[in-house]
């Protein structure tokens, strides 16, 4: 087994390598003078079981091309098997054509890219839409960050907690967490826009008065909706508001939104490196997925069961 990484998440890749007691593979991943991606594998990989650790987060296109070019370099160097470990899978939100709009299904395009260049297997975490697995012509292991989040939740001292889904689409995830979190009550934020150019209205389904609210989501992008949800929960009498999410995208004006929000703490995983400005926020806490990903990689390499790691799915 050998691990390689591009420039997207070198810190997480190093932590995974440390957990597996191996060193990262020697590869030069940089740029030519005109900005094109330059890759060279600096060690023998012939017949090897290779894992490339690379999130396709921002800069999304650069990181994606790095991954694709690394796969090609390793394939041409006669690696026996190549697994792309993509903790955060970019373009996952472009997974369908809404009302037959003239738009691409970009997640399918990316899947085709990876399959055609020679990836044998995909390992990812909390795909935004699980059906994306069907876009690939190779096996996909979509593992869950929720056990790590749940473990942290169980260690906290919440006051009369209630798990909150920030939208209807996240109900199944929130319900599963609530059940495992001591069968805690659940609330749902129902978001609706009465008509165009009218501000979105948020209604709370459930009683959050005098309770600590735990918002559960798969990702935080600009944080606008999440911060507005926290405001509504506080208006309804919530004591404190905590947000747990796997992927910290934090794009656009996320810093400003979080800085002025009423969220007491945001707990996220290390699938995407945080910008230095975001790291200065006092209410951000990071959990690492390195142990879980290292064990998953070990199991893939040894042809062991992945599903046995999870006694539930969220």
Curated annotation (Swiss-Prot):
The principal localisation class reads: cytoplasm
Instruction: Please give the Gene Ontology molecular function terms for this protein.
Output: ATP binding; kinase activity; magnesium ion binding; ribose phosphate diphosphokinase activity
Q: Pfam families in the record, alphabetically? A: Pribosyl_synth (PF14572), Pribosyltran_N (PF13793)
* UniProt-annotated location(s): Cytoplasm
May I have one GO cellular component term? cytoplasm
> Which catalytic residues are annotated?
191
Q: In the record's cofactor note, how is the cofactor described as bound? A: Binds 2 Mg(2+) ions per subunit.
The UniProt record gives the binding positions of Mg(2+) 2 as 167
What's a single GO BP term from this record? purine nucleotide biosynthetic process
State which Enzyme Commission number(s) the record gives: 2.7.6.1
Q: Which residues cross the membrane?
A: none
Ordered alphabetically, the record's keywords are: ATP-binding, Cytoplasm, Kinase, Magnesium, Metal-binding, Nucleotide biosynthesis, Nucleotide-binding, Transferase
Q: Which cofactor does it need?
A: Mg(2+)
| SUPFAM superfamilies recorded | PRTase-like (SSF53271)
Give the binding site residues for Mg(2+) 1: 128
The residues that the entry says bind ATP are 34-36, 93-94
Q: What reactions does this protein catalyze?
A: D-ribose 5-phosphate + ATP = 5-phospho-alpha-D-ribose 1-diphosphate + AMP + H(+)
Which InterPro entries does this UniProt record tie to the protein?
PRib_PP_synth_CS, Pribosyltran_N, PRibTrfase_dom, PRTase-like, Rib-P_diPkinase, Rib-P_diPkinase_bac
Its pathway is: Metabolic intermediate biosynthesis; 5-phospho-alpha-D-ribose 1-diphosphate biosynthesis; 5-phospho-alpha-D-ribose 1-diphosphate from D-ribose 5-phosphate (route I): step 1/1
Binding sites annotated in the UniProt record for D-ribose 5-phosphate? 193, 217, 221-225
Subunit and partners = Homohexamer.
- In UniProt terms, what function does this protein have? Involved in the biosynthesis of the central metabolite phospho-alpha-D-ribosyl-1-pyrophosphate (PRPP) via the transfer of pyrophosphoryl group from ATP to 1-hydroxyl of ribose-5-phosphate (Rib-5-P).
Give the protein family.
Belongs to the ribose-phosphate pyrophosphokinase family. Class I subfamily.
Entry's PANTHER family? RIBOSE-PHOSPHATE DIPHOSPHOKINASE FAMILY MEMBER (PTHR10210), RIBOSE-PHOSPHATE PYROPHOSPHOKINASE 1, CHLOROPLASTIC (PTHR10210:SF41)
Under HAMAP family, the record lists:
RibP_PPkinase_B
Protein name (record):
Ribose-phosphate pyrophosphokinase
Instruction: State the gene name recorded for this protein.
Output: prs
């Amino acid at each position: 087994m050998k691990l390689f990484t591009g420039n997207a998440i070198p810190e997480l890749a190093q932590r995974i390598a440390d957990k597996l007691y191996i060193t990262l593979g020697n590869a030069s991943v940089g740029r030519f003078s005109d900005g094109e991606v330059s890759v060279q594998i600096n060690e023998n990989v012939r017949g090897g079981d290779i894992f490339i650790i690379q999130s396709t987060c921002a800069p999304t296109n650069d990181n994606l091309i790095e991954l694709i070019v690394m796969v090609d370099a390793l394939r041409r160097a006669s690696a026996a098997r190549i697994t792309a470990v993509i903790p955060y899978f970019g373009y996952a939100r472009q997974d369908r054509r809404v009302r037959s709009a003239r738009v691409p299904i970009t997640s399918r395009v990316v899947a085709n890219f990876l399959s055609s260049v020679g990836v044998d297997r995909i390992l990812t975490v909390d795909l935004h839409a699980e059906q994306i697995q069907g876009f690939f012509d190779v096996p996909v292991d979509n593992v869950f960050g929720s056990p790590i989040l749940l473990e942290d939740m169980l260690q906290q001292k919440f006051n009369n907690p209630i798990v909150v889904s920030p939208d209807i689409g996240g109900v199944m995830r929130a319900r599963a967490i609530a059940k495992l979190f001591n069968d805690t009550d659940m609330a749902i934020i129902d978001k609706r826009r009465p008509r165009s150019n009218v501000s979105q209205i948020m209604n709370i389904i459930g009683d959050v008065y005098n309770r600590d609210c735990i918002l559960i989501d798969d990702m935080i992008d600009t944080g606008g909706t999440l911060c507005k949800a926290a405001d509504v929960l506080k208006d309804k009498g919530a004591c404190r508001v905590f947000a747990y999410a796997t992927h910290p995208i934090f794009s656009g004006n996320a810093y400003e939104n979080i800085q002025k929000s009423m969220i007491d703490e945001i707990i996220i995983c290390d699938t995407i490196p945080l910008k230095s400005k975001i790291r200065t926020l006092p209410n951000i806490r990071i959990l690492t997925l390195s142990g879980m990903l290292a064990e998953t990689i070990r199991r893939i390499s040894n042809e062991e069961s992945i599903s046995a790691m999870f006694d539930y799915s969220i």
